[in-house]
Amino acid sequence: QSSTVTPNVVVAADGSGDYKTVSEAVAAAPEDSKTRYVIRIKAGVYRENVDVPKKKKNIMFLGDGRTSTIITASKNVQDGSTTFNSATVAAVGAGFLARDITFQNTAGAAKHQAVALRVGSDLSAFYRCDILAYQDSLYVHSNRQFFINCFIAGTVDFIFGNAAVVLQDCDIHARRPGSGQKNMVTAQGRTDPNQNTGIVIQKSRIGATSDLQPVQSSFPTYLGRPWKEYSRTVVMQSSITNVINPAGWFPWDGNFALDTLYYGEYQNTGAGAATSGRVTWKGFKVITSSTEAQGFTPGSFIAGGSWLKATTFPFSLGL
């Protein structure tokens, strides 16, 4: 798996590499690198919080497989962290790539916000990664991001933030939340209509984990709710199981943002994809024009034609 990329350094929990922790390898990496710096993370469970700061550019985390290389921690809001600082892994330096790794926050549903992965890295991409937590699993904080063949699981607002991000060919599963909670797949945070940000889920599969499936009637699950006034989310060309409530989307607080948000659905399939029972908000629409849908593809929305090829990850630019 990792033979196609030659690592600069190797991290191994068992001491057989250059470093025993991922954090040590990141600290030793060059600053402002113009070329890719590959940190191979051998199979193992790495219990640490890892920060890839702004100066650490073009870093790649290369794991041995999503079931074998696991970075895990449990910081959370209930125990005194902020949502922002709770992330098990935070990637900010531009050009960050990760492949064949699990990012996990094990705080659990009762601990409120607890982020597995926060990304503020421009032109960042993730391939064959698992992102596992409960509330606020994946913080797509800012800049242009791409996720391909990833598995994302969580409960409340589990993909959230204000990046321009496309999740393509991903499996996105709601899991059993805490008592009385509703699941929200997304909570997009656009604060101004001029921002070119949004969450796009394309050619993906939205469903439920095995712990939610038998009880999904007790825990309503929605495609998203508007965290900020101009929240923008598009779900297109994806299969949606009956885990998603027929209304599709849920308010944040009364009428807040319902006229100013942009929520679109385009050519989805599956038991949860029917749009006849959807919300009637001014900001919600079933997209019928392929031209409009094209604007949310990786080629248009995140300028994928200029950078995705260099990631070496698979992708498709269009519809």
UniProtKB/Swiss-Prot annotation:
What does the record list as GO biological process?
A: cell wall modification; pectin catabolic process
Q: What is its EC number?
A: 3.1.1.11
Q: Where found in the cell?
A: Secreted, Cell wall
Q: Which reaction does it catalyse?
A: [(1->4)-alpha-D-galacturonosyl methyl ester](n) + n H2O = [(1->4)-alpha-D-galacturonosyl](n) + n methanol + n H(+)
Main subcellular location of this protein, as a coarse class: secreted
User: Organism's domain of life?
Assistant: Eukaryota
UniProt-listed Pfam families: Pectinesterase
Give an example GO cellular component term for this record. extracellular region
Q: In this chain's numbering, which residues are marked as the site (Transition state stabilizer)?
A: 135
Which InterPro entries does the record cross-reference, listed alphabetically? Pectin_lyas_fold, Pectin_lyase_fold/virulence, Pectinesterase_Asp_AS, Pectinesterase_cat, Pectinesterase_Tyr_AS
> Electron transport as a keyword?
no
Query: Molecular function (GO) terms listed?
Result: pectinesterase activity
**Pathway it works in:** Glycan metabolism; pectin degradation; 2-dehydro-3-deoxy-D-gluconate from pectin: step 1/5
Positions of disulphide bridges: 150-170
Pyrrolidone carboxylic acid modified-residue sites: 1
Question: Where, by residue number, is the active site?
Answer: 136, 157
Q: What class of enzyme is it?
A: hydrolase
Q: Which family does it belong to?
A: Belongs to the pectinesterase family.
State what this protein does: Catalyzes the deesterification of methyl-esterified D-galactosiduronic acid units in pectic compounds. It participates in modulating cell wall during fruit ripening, cell wall extension during pollen germination, and in defense mechanisms against pathogens.
Q: What is this protein called?
A: Pectinesterase
User: What species does this protein belong to?
Assistant: Daucus carota
